[in-house]
Regions:
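Short beta-strand-loop/turn "lid" adjacent to the catalytic site in phosphate-handling enzymes
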Residues: 1-18, 40-49
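Gly-rich Lys/Arg/Thr-decorated short loops/hinges at beta-loop-alpha junctions or inter-strand turns
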Residues: 2-5, 49-54, 170-178
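Glycine-rich phosphate-binding loop plus the immediately following alpha-helix
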Residues: 19-25, 35, 42, 50, ...
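Adenine-nucleotide phosphate-binding core of ATP-dependent small-molecule kinases
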Residues: 148, 152-203
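Glycine-rich phosphate-binding loops at beta-strand->alpha-helix junctions
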Residues: 205-210
Length: 210
């Protein structure tokens, strides 16, 4: 597991450090270390993995810790077992993932790390592939620069120069129409992704949780 995380096979993220840190502490104090609640889970239906390119499959890479925790809390509030419910859960952070939870399994979800789904405060989300590959092969950008446009310097940061929601709210309240419009663009894309998950669940949705 340590070797797997050190090469970032599914993308660079701070959560990859968890097991490495745990192992270092455990080795130092000669104690066992465990993964109890995984950072990511893969419960996707096979049909959700396929794309129009046989070489590329969709991956289950999302904010599983938060989505699962929120699902359990919501189930308690609804006085039902998580494994009896169909839920749509939207994690709204620096990255945004929206999952279709069917009877305790996340059967489809956007990959918030690799530019799948809505734009977020600092990620581009899905973009048309034609203009993207023209950018990639234009000679004007390095691979690292393209990656930053997708992850870290995309979304609200790319348009408004900040990922700070409080600052953007102040700008909107002061009459900044560009900030208002771009924020609405992000909200539109989130709502669209939620609607997509409703289709995955065949319209049988017990709750939408944001």
């Amino acid at each position: 597991m340590i070797d797997y995380m050190n090469v970032y096979p599914r993308g660079e993220h701070a959560s990859n450090l968890g097991c490495v840190i745990a192992k270092n502490i455990a080795d130092h104090y000669q104690l066992p270390s465990f993964i109890v609640d995984p950072v990511a889970v893969d419960e996707m239906e096979d049909i959700a993995r396929f794309t129009g390119m046989p070489e590329i499959r969709r991956m289950s890479l999302f904010h599983a810790l938060n989505q699962k925790a929120v699902a359990l809390k919501a189930s308690k509030d609804l006085k039902k077992d998580y494994h009896e419910l169909n839920l749509i859960i939207a994690h709204l952070g620096g990255g945004i993932s929206v999952g279709a939870h069917q009877k305790g399994r996340v059967i489809d979800v956007n990959n918030a790390l690799d530019g799948d789904g809505p734009m977020s405060p600092e990620r581009s989300g899905s973009v048309p592939i034609g203009p993207l590959y023209k950018m990639v092969f234009s000679g004007q950008y390095t691979l690292a620069e393209i990656k930053r446009k997708n992850y870290g310097q995309g979304g609200l940061v790319a348009y408004l120069g900040t990922n700070d929601g409080a600052e953007i709210k102040k700008r909107i309240d002061s009459g900044d129409q560009e900030a208002k419009f771009i924020y609405e663009v992000m909200c539109y894309q989130i709502a669209k992704e939620i609607g997509s998950c409703s289709t995955v669940l065949k319209g049988k949705v017990d709750a939408i949780i944001i």
